[in-house]
A protein has these predicted regions:
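Gram-negative outer-membrane beta-barrel domains
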Residues: 3, 20-170
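Cleavable N-terminal signal peptides
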Residues: 10-11, 18-21
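Bacterial N-terminal signal peptides that target proteins for export
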Residues: 1-8
Length: 170
């Protein structure tokens, strides 16, 4: 009788341990969660308009507006053209057009630029420089540019220019 009790106790113990070890959550046709992209895709192509402020050698400050267009030639190769007008703190004005070529990533772009400009004091100049732009929202970007304005009449009026502004992309 004692061996029967011992066998019954051993059987209950084995069944109890095995039942607890095999308990698990039941999986019934669960749907996979949503898939998210690791980055936000930005299309730099198309027209844009913007406003900017500038500072240049000789303590001259400017306030300007620009219109431009960008084209993605390849996945990351950006080309564009831009025209701008500005009022300067020395009571002069300037207008310029330039082309740009650079690299566009998901939310930022870097580029080189070159063009031609005129102003009310020194007549003609050639701007060359570099710029960077970062997309802040779907259609709004922040830009920063450095330009060297090479005066085509005299080197005495050459200038270093820093521009900061916003562009609205259509």
């Amino acid at each position: 009788m004692r061996s029967l009790k011992l066998a019954l106790l051993a059987t209950v113990a084995v069944v109890g341990i095995t039942s607890a070890a095999s308990a698990a959550d039941l999986i019934i046709g669960s749907e996979p969660g949503p898939v998210y992209d690791d980055y936000a895709s930005v299309d730099w192509s198309g027209p844009y308009a913007g406003l900017w402020v500038s500072g240049q050698t000789g303590s001259i400050f400017g306030l300007g507006a620009n219109l431009g267009v960008n084209v993605l030639i390849d996945k990351n190769l950006l080309a564009g053209a831009e025209g701008s007008v500005a009022w300067l703190s020395d009571d002069s004005w300037q207008g310029q057009v330039h082309g740009k070529l650079g690299f566009a990533a998901e939310t930022f772009a870097i580029y080189g630029l070159a063009g031609i400009g005129v102003n009310s004091i020194t007549d003609a100049y050639a701007p060359v420089g570099v710029g960077a732009e970062v997309m802040l929202a779907d259609n709004l970007s922040l830009k920063a540019e450095y330009q060297y304005k090479w005066d085509l009449d005299t080197s005495a009026d050459d200038a270093h220019v820093a521009k900061f502004g916003f562009n609205w992309h259509f």
